[in-house]
Design a protein with these regions (language model features):
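Long, contiguous C-terminal flanking segments immediately downstream of a protein's structured core
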Residues: 73-224
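Glycine-rich beta-solenoid repeat tracts in large extracellular/virion proteins
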Residues: 2-7, 24-36, 55-62, 79-103, ...
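Right-handed parallel beta-helix
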Residues: 1-28, 32-33, 38-53, 65-77, ...
Length: 224
C-alpha cells in the first residue's frame, strides 16, 4: 500500500504515524498543479515513519518550500531489504513540465532534528553506518533524483534553506520524544481498536504481523 500525497499552501502535517507502506511516505505534491512554487509551503514535523519501502520512501516535491523537522524514522524489515532507502529522509526531484510548472522546477528544503532508529535486526552494517551519518548530518538523508532535470547549477546547496519556513505555530518535540507521544496518542487513542493496537505494537516491537495476500512480505499489504 501507499502512504499518502501531502501538500498545500501553508499546511502542517505533525504527529502522524505512517507504517507498512511500500512508497509515498509521503509523496509531496509540489506546485505541479498550481504553478505557484512560492505559495506551496508545507511543514512536516514530529511524524513517525515505520517500515517503508522497498519501492520508495518520501519523494518528489516538484516546486515548493518544505520543512522536515524532528521526525522519527524507524526502518523495518521491508525497509532493510534496500540499503539506499534505510537512511533516506526524502528524495526530491525536478518537475518534468507536463503540468503547470516549467520543467526543471525544484523544491527548497529546510531539514533539521530528524532521527533514524537503527534497532531493526535486518539492517546491514552499511545501512547502520549511513544511519549514523544521517543522524549527525540530516542532509546525508536527502537524495535528489535528477532523472527529470539537474539540480540548480548542479549543486545541492541550491535546494537548501538556511532557515525554516514560517507556518502556523505547532507544539514541537524532539524526534525521540515525538516517537513516544505519537505511539501513545495517535489514532483513536481513547479506546484502541484492534487495528490501531496491532500497528502500534508492530512499530514498538520493530516487527510485523501479517504477510500480503498476493506475495508481498515483511508486513506490506497487497489487497483491499
Amino acid at each position: 500500500g501507499y502512504g499518502g500525497i501531502w501538500g498545500g499552501e501553508g499546511a502542517t502535517f505533525h504527529h502522524n504515524l505512517l507504517a507498512h507502506h511500500k512508497s509515498r511516505t509521503p509523496r509531496l505534491c509540489g506546485s505541479r498543479y498550481t504553478g505557484r512554487p512560492n505559495d506551496e509551503i508545507v511543514d512536516l514535523r514530529n511524524n513517525v515513519f515505520y517500515n517503508w519501502g522497498p519501492t520508495n520512501g518520501g519523494y518528489a516535491g516538484e516546486g515548493g518550500n518544505y520543512n522536515f523537522i524532528n521526525n522519527y524514522y524507524k526502518p523495518g524489515p521491508s525497509t532493510a531489504t534496500k540499503d539506499n532507502i534505510t537512511y533516506r529522509i526524502f528524495s526530491p526531484n525536478a518537475d518534468d513540465g507536463t503540468q503547470t510548472n516549467a520543467p526543471g522546477v525544484w523544491g527548497v528544503f529546510y531539514v533539521s532534528g530528524n532521527y533514524f532508529d537503527d534497532s531493526c535486526s535486518k539492517l546491514s552494517s552499511k545501512s547502520k553506518t549511513n544511519i549514523a551519518k544521517t543522524n549527525a548530518d540530516n542532509w546525508v538523508g536527502i537524495h535528489p533524483n535528477t532523472n527529470n532535470g539537474a539540480l540548480p547549477e548542479g549543486n545541492i546547496e541550491n535546494i537548501k534553506s538556511p532557515v525554516e519556513f514560517k507556518t502556523a505555530s505547532t507544539t514541537t518535540h524532539t524526534a525521540i520524544a515525538a516517537y513516544e507521544k505519537v505511539l501513545d496518542y495517535v489514532g483513536a487513542s481513547l479506546k484502541r481498536d484492534v487495528i490501531d493496537a496491532r500497528v502500534i505494537s508492530d512499530v514498538r516491537n520493530g516487527n510485523y504481523t501479517f504477510e500480503g495476500s498476493n506475495g508481498s512480505s515483511n508486513g506490506l499489504i497487497d489487497s483491499q
